[in-house]
From Swiss-Prot:
The lineage of its organism: Viruses, Duplodnaviria, Heunggongvirae, Peploviricota, Herviviricetes. Keywords: Coiled coil. Residues 25-59, 77-141, 242-294 are annotated as: Disordered. Residues 201-234 form a coiled coil. This is Uncharacterized protein ORF90. Residues 86-139, 260-283 have a biased composition (Acidic residues). Residues 242-259 have a biased composition (Basic and acidic residues).
């Protein structure tokens, strides 16, 4: 057998050889005619004759990896230590804040200048909130609560039906615009819808700011419509519990709940009581038939 063929076959079946240099580590595998190909490499440079060159790997890479692991572990320990200290400080702050909140609740002080007080329709409020003067000379507005739960729901229905919302306006100096905080009609600090002003009503867009010119474009008829619908709904809530149309009323013509006076309501209630007493007396009367002797 030819010696060249033997050497060629030996190169094809040879194991990868690890060549260690002073500055770099290279892995080679003989591939035909002495060409070199790098094994397990992420990137490779291609030479002019088309053969791939091995990527140089620094000897200090292993040391760098271990150094990074050690650094990360030390950083994690420091972060955990700082986090534990922070939690202890945060607990102390929470205790102080709880004491401050309890004091402010008894004194009636407001906790924030920007937040508006909101009330649920399911709860009744009969007392007026009168905040005391704080150290910062902040005067919170006195909120007068509506007297009835039905009035609250009537106001909310009125708001949804008209697509309007009440706004509280404060000046924003850096933008030279009016910052508008939205609140519902039931949270208005007024006793009656008659005290409602034109500036409080506008077709709303959420998360927007309005200028003075935009607020000036609100018309009087919108306010009148709000008041009218509010009064009608309030009457609806008051009368719907006492007036019920019967089948005879439906045949003769449905009774309009909004045009019935309170005197008529009292008369109908008294008539019903008289009818009930008459029925009871008729039931108590019994006829006794004595047998006749022959």
């Amino acid at each position: 057998m030819d010696s060249e063929l033997v050497s060629y076959l030996a190169e094809q079946t040879a194991e990868p050889r690890l060549v260690i240099d002073e500055d770099e580590v290279q892995v080679y595998r003989p591939v035909g005619q002495g060409a070199k190909r790098r094994i397990n490499s992420e990137e490779s440079d291609v030479s002019e004759d088309g053969n791939s060159k091995p990527k140089r790997v620094r000897r200090s890479s292993v040391e760098i990896i271990f150094r990074e692991i050690k650094k990360n572990n030390e950083k994690k320990l420091k972060d955990d230590f700082k986090a534990s200290d922070y939690e202890e400080l945060e607990d102390d702050d929470d205790d102080e804040s709880i004491e401050e909140e309890s004091d402010s609740e008894f004194e009636g002080e407001s906790s924030s200048d920007e937040e508006e007080s909101s009330y649920d329709s399911d709860s009744d409020y009969d007392s007026e909130t009168e905040p005391e003067d704080s150290d910062d000379d902040f005067e919170a507005p006195v909120v007068k609560i509506p007297e009835d739960r039905q009035v609250l729901s009537a106001k909310r229905r009125c708001t949804r039906s008209l697509g309007v919302i009440v706004k509280t306006v404060e000046e924003v100096t850096h933008e030279n615009r009016l910052k508008v905080n939205s609140m519902s009609v039931c949270d208005l600090p007024i006793d009656n819808m008659a005290d409602l002003k034109v500036e409080h009503i506008k077709f709303y867009k959420r998360n927007t700011t309005f200028t003075e010119e935009e607020l000036a474009e609100i018309e009087e008829d919108l306010l009148a419509e709000v008041k009218a619908r509010y009064n009608n709904m309030k009457g609806d809530f008051r009368r719907s519990k006492t007036i019920e149309t019967t089948e005879d009323d439906k045949k003769a013509g449905e009774v309009n709940k909004y045009d019935i006076d309170d005197d008529f309501i009292e008369k109908t209630e008294s008539d019903e009581e008289e009818e009930i007493t008459e029925d009871d007396s008729s039931e108590q009367e019994t006829v006794v038939v004595e047998p006749v002797d022959e």
